[in-house]
Amino acid sequence: MSKKEIVAMILAGGQGSRLGVLTKNLAKPAVPFGGKYRIIDFPLSNCSNSGIYTVGVLTQYKPLKLNEHIGIGDTWDLDRRDGGVSILPPYQKEKGGDWYKGTANAIYQNIEFIERYDPEYVLILSGDHIYKMDYDKMLEMHKQKEADATIAVINVPMHEASRFGIMNTNEDLSIYEFEEKPEHPKSTNASMGIYIFNWKILKKFLEEDELDPSSSNDFGKNIIPKMLNSGKKLIAYPFNGYWKDVGTIESLWEANMDLLKYEDELSLYDSEWKIYSANPVRPAQFIGKDAEIKSSLTVEGCIVHGKVENSVLFQGVYVGKGAIVKDAVIMPNTKIEDNVLIEKAIIGSEAIVCKGCKIGDGNKISVIASKEVVIGSKEIIEECAMVK
């Protein structure tokens, strides 16, 4: 393998337990988003658009759909003999093996993979955030500042800062303190979980951390504080674009709804920074003569006979006559039968909502699992009758 300046490592093994039934049989990075995509498409597309063509995807929980989606990486121009994309699950080694115990341990277990390319830098990414970023610009700042580590940060409202890891910085953007979810934050520079490290330095800290029995083997809780305490130069890279951690039902629903705003910050229509995804070939969408669609995303393969308002419909969704779908996210190949009312909900892939059902009350977000068949008629999903 030829030497690479930078290798990207995408942490994509999370269970996503806060997404409930949506990740019962699916890794969080493989959850559908925005009508045509899966969450993992965003960091993969960012890598490709940034000219980073050596990428490791670290998988663990329910990886089948995620592995199938990534395939050989051709969708993102990552099907390369020298580099490209590699799926990296935990594996048995000569001295035994183990599941990834934390974000830092996941990278530690793949030191051999990284060393194959002898990189100057390693880019660490989360596989479950929605955003568009040019990592090359971040790398350029890392070099200019002669940093040992550069951490992307985003400004959040002060009342939300206690939910994040906060980077307190000097005027030159050097980080002097890291606070993990502080009760009384000193600043609003929230860590985005995007790191660039000088590889030789990171490798040393990973090896030392692995020998510490008290460590939780986590970048935010262990590696970053240890680097600060040892006097390493850490720099904050301010990011001003759209960024969303879609780790909860509420944030996933909100991120989909954000796509419907008149001024969409994420801008999936930007020809200069495309988000790529592996999608099956579908026929054109069909809109029936009595259908009505307002402020919605509907993609190829959809058949709509009813009313759709402020909603996101994925490939192959069917909406029957007299059905009303409002403020909803309907994932691929789901069938909404006649006279159904859905309001403020997320419906998983390949579900069937039977004739006359009512899901949601317009207040809380209701959720239907993938491949469920809803046969009841209740206002709140917890009261709905569902059968396999």
Swiss-Prot record:
GO terms for biological process: glycogen biosynthetic process. The lineage of its organism: Bacteria, Bacillati, Bacillota, Clostridia, Eubacteriales. Keywords: ATP-binding, Carbohydrate metabolism, Glycogen biosynthesis, Glycogen metabolism, Nucleotide-binding, Nucleotidyltransferase, Transferase. GO terms for molecular function: ATP binding; glucose-1-phosphate adenylyltransferase activity. It comes from Clostridium perfringens (strain SM101 / Type A). CDD domains: ADP_Glucose_PP (cd02508), LbH_G1P_AT_C (cd04651). This is Glucose-1-phosphate adenylyltransferase. Pfam families: Hexapep_GlmU, NTP_transferase. Involved in the biosynthesis of ADP-glucose, a building block required for the elongation reactions to produce glycogen. Catalyzes the reaction between ATP and alpha-D-glucose 1-phosphate (G1P) to produce pyrophosphate and ADP-Glc. InterPro entries: ADP-Glc_PPase, ADP_Glu_pyroP_CS, GlgC_bac, GlmU/GlgC-like_hexapep, NTP_transferase_dom, Nucleotide-diphossugar_trans, Trimer_LpxA-like_sf. Belongs to the bacterial/plant glucose-1-phosphate adenylyltransferase family. Its EC number is 2.7.7.27.
